[in-house]
Amino acid sequence: MLTKYALVAVIVLCLTVLGFTLLVGDSLCEFTVKERNIEFKAVLAYEPKK
């Protein structure tokens, strides 16, 4: 039963990050979440359009 809730939590987290990424679009270069002793960091590596 616990794994079912953990799976739902991971799916909700992924959907939240995906939604946030779609909302901010091109202005997102780095996203960091710090929670007690856990740090989640996403960095977007890209080449600007010329």
From Swiss-Prot:
Keywords: Cell inner membrane, Cell membrane, Membrane, Toxin-antitoxin system, Transmembrane, Transmembrane helix. Its main location: membrane. The keyword Cell inner membrane applies. The chain crosses the membrane at residues 5-25. It holds the Pfam family HOK_GEF. It comes from the Bacteria. It is a single-pass membrane protein. InterPro entries: Hok/gef_toxin, Hok/gef_toxin_CS. It is found in: Cell inner membrane. One of its GO terms (cellular component) is plasma membrane. Toxic component of a type I toxin-antitoxin (TA) system. When overexpressed kills cells within minutes; causes collapse of the transmembrane potential and arrest of respiration. Its toxic effect is probably neutralized by an antisense antitoxin Sok RNA. Belongs to the Hok/Gef family. This is Protein HokE. It comes from Shigella flexneri. The lineage of its organism: Bacteria, Pseudomonadati, Pseudomonadota, Gammaproteobacteria, Enterobacterales.
